[in-house]
């Protein structure tokens, strides 16, 4: 009803949404685009299209299963309450798997993003909410000191051509090519593997002290937010 959509708009600042599912164990409210929406300022606008019911049916179980791993207490601390399902998500005309906005407690997920990395991308975007919610944690300066001396990240995640999301077995401090783009993306990539592929990550990091330091850093910072947090 229009009352609901007005309330949803008031809370999330996104138009054209309706409720999809309110029965989560951790308080997340799942919303979906009823028609396409476009929000934000011109050079940084976010746009996304209405998803088909079939696509939602295929992906919703996966999204919910992954997000149900987070306790309500933790989600409240990182300001995540609303998850918006849509497809063909873009920021400033660049395709993206998700858009987190901790100020309105909302994570937008493109349910049609690359299925190979879909589950991992959920945790990747959730990490950005944690990072954005805590200015005093996840120091980029500390993180950059883990890398070899002459390594430099790009100015921003979209101003580099380091975009491959597949696992680098011979890691040398970086788990994917995309993790070489910025410190923030590097952290989110490591966190996403910690949540979805810890077995592989543990094997790789045995021979990679840089990666091992990065994993330990993420554990210690996440535990400062919630010391009961479980990665498994």
Model-predicted segments: where are they?
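Non-catalytic architectural context of zinc metalloproteases
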Residues: 2-55, 87-88, 155-168, 184-186, ...
